[in-house]
């Protein structure tokens, strides 16, 4: 499951804030932030790969009753995509490794390679396969991927990493040298 952290600017004189999430076209309250100085709320246990809409409004407590202000602008945001899965090595040569994986709902996939003990992003693709080229012969390489979903505000949301896979490149073919006649 995913979580989304909402934050807003302080409203002068507010006793607290009502956090609302769209459901069936309405915005019922999902949280009561009971401090006018608390300016964030994290919504937890949201399903992966969904779009969610939120609004926040300040309130002031007057004689024991809450008097609400107007709603904020709408937050329309995406939750993290599902974890990437099904990563496997499809083919190996002396200088390349072809990876493939299972399609899930996301904007693109990020491919990572373990280099000098650190995972480095080496590619971004919308396909469900990628060929890593220019590798050294007879060398073992490790790879993993993760899905990325981009929301309306161009913010990226990442799923969990796949399990890693490894592949060992083969020995380069012998070079045939022609003999002159």
Label every model-predicted segment.
Residues 8, 19, 43, 55-56, ...:
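An aromatic-rich alpha-helical recognition segment common to small helix-rich domains
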Residues 39-41, 128-130:
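Short strand-edge motifs at loop-to-beta-strand transitions and within beta-strands
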Residues 23, 61-62, 114-115, 149, ...:
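Acidic surface patches and DE-rich sequence motifs
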Residues 25-26, 63-67, 117-118, 152-157:
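Short, solvent-exposed loop/turn segments that connect beta-strands within catalytic domains
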Residues 13-31, 103-122, 126-127, 144-146:
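Extracellular low-complexity, O-glycosylation-prone stalks/linkers
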